Amino acid sequence: TMARILLVDDEQYIRELYSEELSAEGHNVATLATGQNLMRKIDNLQPEVVVLDIRLVDYDGLELLQEIRTEHRDLPVILCTAYDTYKYDQKTIAADYYVVKSFDLSQLKIAIQRAIETNGSLSELQ
């Protein structure tokens, strides 16, 4: 299943790598290098999944996660980070999935697939 994905990461090579890989799978990927206009971007793009880096140069991804949850309760958010330690942070619980960054995107792809499937079934029920 293809999805509209919004990828938020301040590292250019990650944006390029993930964007390329996910687009190759048929997804429609938009990227943001900063958390600055995230909420506006979500409103404009209406993504089905947000892939969010926890440590952005200008924002704390966990705070952005709370903002997303306030405005878009059912939008699946996949936290992506190079730091495994965040898994034990209470604030990450609000995310649907937690993926440790790697050049192997299989974990991320599985999370995206699950997010689409779960969210699809939710929106059909309502």
Specify the residue positions occupied by each region the protein language model found.
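Short amphipathic alpha-helix used as the core "switch/output" element in two-component signaling
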Residues: 40, 62-73
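Alpha4 helix (beta4-alpha4-beta5 surface) of REC/receiver domains from two-component response regulators
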Residues: 63, 83-101, 106-110
